[in-house]
């Protein structure tokens, strides 16, 4: 594929030598939306492009992690996928829309530092962004989520976006699913609630992504099982859900066991997540309604 120099940096040429006659070269890329020009976006083959809308949160993560943890982890993961190069996804284009670093986090509002949208505002925001993405001609949208408080809203709106905008919509959520299960095999040392919030998983990822923001000397482990009494049916995982807020189940703001976290685990988990996500994207690329 041809490149050109723009301000000293190589940039993919959108048009071949016959561009003046209307000929275009196909563009294949893994990129962030905000780094593309309008013409680069317009030139993408919409039948071979998946747009990812990353959703995260700004909320308390215990005494040892920054409030931007969910957003930092998600952004780092996106950077690592992009760093693998365009050839890492031969099935077409992966375009990461600008991340939404605020979500629905009202469960954490009793702790300082949390910023949240109401359910109504968050729904409207997601719908407007998806409408804008569809207006650029894209047909396939993935809601790519790193915050458990967003999960119900994303699952709800995915069908509405299909009905209202005609988009093929998918939700990749690494909470309340088995997304991390294989990656944690052989390295997880914490128990049932060891991986949940400001936990072994998130703390390990942050030790790898942004170690200067992690205060391991302040990390505490907290198991919410006592708050659920019987812990058989009514748990934070279900099968019977409760409308709990974070302060109902933890004093520290931690749900899990961050003291088991290590940077080595974080490295392995990022590698695992990159590989798994590319596999998921490959399957999504083959699906259309």
Model-based region annotation:
Residues 15-28:
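Short, Lys/Arg-enriched N-terminal segments with co-localized hydrophobic residues
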Residues 5, 15-18, 48:
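Generic low-complexity, intrinsically disordered sequence content enriched
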Residues 25-140, 148-289:
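Extended, histidine- and acidic-residue-enriched regions that form the cofactor-binding/catalytic faces
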Residues 7-8, 52:
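Selective for proline/serine-rich intrinsically disordered segments
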Residues 143:
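Conserved SAM-binding loop
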